[in-house]
Amino acid sequence: MNYQSEWLRIDPIKGSRRFSNLCWAFILVLGAIGFSLVGFSSYLGRDLIPILSSQQIIFLPQGIVMCFYGIAGIFLGFYLWCTILWNVGSGYNQFNKREGIVYLFRWGFPGENRRICIRFMIKDIQAIRMEIQEGFSPRRVLYLRIKGQQDVPLTRLDEELTLREMEEKAAELARFLRVSIEGF
């Protein structure tokens, strides 16, 4: 949900709290626990869970490798659950004409630099740039072209916008900021 008035525009940005990330985290942790249990079952010589048979798996080398993959998967799953819990990457883009300032705010990982805020002047914005790559893995990203700096992405790299939505978003923002659009 965007907010726009005559002087202010706020575009919220979704972070890592997405349904696909929840599914991947859940599947990853379940698979990792299964691998770990089968590996430990092969070490003990008996099945810890009746559904997961380890009778044909010798501890050296298969069982130890399954334990390693299971533990690595648990750590990776823990990392993914933490990014979902902290909602890393979420935030907003705020364009304030009254103050003449653009704020790009994102949440990062906990610590000293959890709040990431990039600020620059609206008068330094040269254009809105669209990067469109079609094919097997399409990529559609909006950038702010700023004088003397590299282009700043406004949308996530994995955000799946249709070409029409991308053009509408770029046109609305260019109209609000009174700049041109590049990269058709």
Curated annotation (Swiss-Prot):
NCBIfam families, per the entry: PRK02542.1
Similarity annotation: Belongs to the Ycf4 family.
Function noted in UniProt: Seems to be required for the assembly of the photosystem I complex.
Signal peptide start and end residues: none
Keywords on record: Chloroplast, Membrane, Photosynthesis, Plastid, Thylakoid, Transmembrane, Transmembrane helix
Transmembrane segments: 22-42, 64-84
Organism, scientific name: Angiopteris evecta (Mule's foot fern)
Predominant cellular place of this UniProt entry's protein: plastid
Record protein name field: Photosystem I assembly protein Ycf4
